[in-house]
Each structure stands twice: as structure tokens, then as C-alpha cells.
């Protein structure tokens, strides 16, 4: 069974080409290609050669092969997207924010409801951003990116801690401002401290309603 815990292994050049062809065919026609169509496209001598490449893609976790049909190919990424947005709870020090152990569940929502599209939801912990309506327990919709402008609300990692704050950069210093007068800004010296942007806030979900 293939699920969201599947660890994808790198593809060979030919495997990547076949994977890209499958995606393109699905986007253009709504259907994956047959083995014969794959063989014809790449000049293989038989459909069996295409079958072997498909088996390799399935073994590496990129597709699922369905028995009994010539077009029995399903992209795993589409299956995972159908689960909804991953909801991230507490993030362990030093671990990637989307590490499987951080995902509490998948929230049945289309990320394209937000602009730019949300890639995951982060459960808000604390009241440091309450003055702009981001409250403890809210689900913050986050677009995963490392590109950020001054004034944007970001999910940032300072050393091993993940925080939601308003971003401002001045030279080699970043200030992460709370939206609550009880909290002082976090000053980050980029020359001496580890700092990463995990994404920008694009919306809030509270009690099942997006805002």
C-alpha cells in the first residue's frame, strides 16, 4: 500500500522522462498512456520495456499500477493531494517542518482556496499574533517558500525553534515582530545564527471556517 509515509527515491533520467510523459498525458487527455504508447513514444522495441520502467516507478513510490487495464497507472502525488492539506502540530527541534511525525492529520481542504496556494496548515501555539487575529489554536494556512518581503507574516525557524511573526530585514539582521505588545521582537544576526523561512501565512482557519 502506498501512503503519505512513502519515501521517494531519486529517478534515473529515463524514469523521469516516463514520469513526465504520464503527467503530461493525464493533464492533456485526462487519462494515463498505455504501455504501448509509452513504448512508441520512446522507441522501445516492445511494451514490455515500458512495463519494466513502470514497475521501477511503482517500486520507488511515484506511481501505483492497477491490474486489469491497459491504462492502469495512477500518480501517487495526486492520491496524496486528495487527502487534503497536512496539519502540522508541534515541530521537533532540528526536524523538517513537514516530517511525517509532525503531521497530526490531513485537513480536507483545497489549498488553492488561498492565494498563493497553501501547502500545509500549522496549528498556532500562543497569543503573540493575536492583535491581527491569529489566535491560539487557529490553523494557519502556509504557502511554502523561502522568498519573503518585509512586512509579511512568516513561519520562521530560528536555530531550532519555529515561530510565526512579522518579518523585517535590515542588512544582516532580521527582526521578527509579534503582534502583541506583551512580546518583544526577536532579533536574528544572520552572520551568527541559523535562520530559515518555512513559508508565508496566506490565511486562517478557525472552528472549521477559513478567514
From Swiss-Prot:
The record marks 93-94 as: Cleavage. GO terms for molecular function: DNA binding; serine-type endopeptidase activity. It comes from the Bacteria. Represses a number of genes involved in the response to DNA damage (SOS response), including recA and lexA. In the presence of single-stranded DNA, RecA interacts with LexA causing an autocatalytic cleavage which disrupts the DNA-binding part of LexA, leading to derepression of the SOS regulon and eventually DNA repair. It catalyses: Hydrolysis of Ala-|-Gly bond in repressor LexA. GO terms for biological process: DNA repair; DNA replication; negative regulation of DNA-templated transcription; proteolysis; SOS response. PANTHER family: LEXA REPRESSOR, LEXA REPRESSOR-RELATED. Residues 35-55 bind DNA. Its EC number is 3.4.21.88. The active site is at residues 128, 165. Keywords: Autocatalytic cleavage, DNA damage, DNA repair, DNA replication, DNA-binding, Hydrolase, Repressor, SOS response, Transcription, Transcription regulation. InterPro entries: LexA, LexA-like, LexA/Signal_pep-like_sf, LexA_DNA-bd_dom, LexA_repressor, Peptidase_S24_LexA, Peptidase_S24_S26A/B/C, WH-like_DNA-bd_sf. This is LexA repressor. It comes from Colwellia psychrerythraea (strain 34H / ATCC BAA-681). CDD domains: S24_LexA-like.
Amino acid at each position: 500500500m502506498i501512503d503519505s509515509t512513502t519515501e521517494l527515491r531519486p529517478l534515473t533520467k529515463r524514469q523521469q522522462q516516463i514520469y513526465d510523459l504520464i503527467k503530461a498525458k493525464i493533464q492533456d487527455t485526462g487519462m494515463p498512456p498505455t504501455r504501448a504508447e509509452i513504448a512508441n513514444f520512446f522507441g522501445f522495441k516492445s511494451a514490455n520495456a515500458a512495463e519494466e520502467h513502470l514497475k521501477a516507478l511503482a517500486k520507488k513510490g511515484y506511481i501505483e499500477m492497477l491490474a486489469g487495464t491497459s491504462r492502469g497507472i495512477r500518480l501517487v502525488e495526486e492520491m496524496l493531494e486528495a487527502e487534503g492539506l497536512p496539519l502540522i502540530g508541534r515541530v521537533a527541534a532540528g526536524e523538517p517542518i513537514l516530517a511525517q511525525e509532525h503531521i497530526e492529520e490531513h485537513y480536507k481542504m483545497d489549498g488553492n482556496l488561498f492565494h498563493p496556494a497553501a501547502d500545509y496548515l500549522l496549528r498556532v501555539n500562543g497569543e503573540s499574533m493575536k492583535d491581527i487575529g491569529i489566535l491560539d489554536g487557529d490553523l494557519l494556512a502556509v504557502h511554502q517558500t523561502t522568498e519573503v518581503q518585509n512586512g509579511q507574516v512568516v513561519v520562521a525557524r530560528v536555530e531550532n525553534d519555529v515561530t510565526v511573526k512579522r518579518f523585517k530585514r535590515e542588512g544582516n539582521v532580521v527582526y521578527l515582530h509579534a503582534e502583541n505588545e506583551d512580546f518583544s521582537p526577536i532579533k536574528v544576526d544572520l552572520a551568527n545564527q541559523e535562520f530559515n523561512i518555512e513559508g508565508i501565512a496566506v490565511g486562517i482557519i478557525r472552528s472549521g471556517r477559513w478567514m
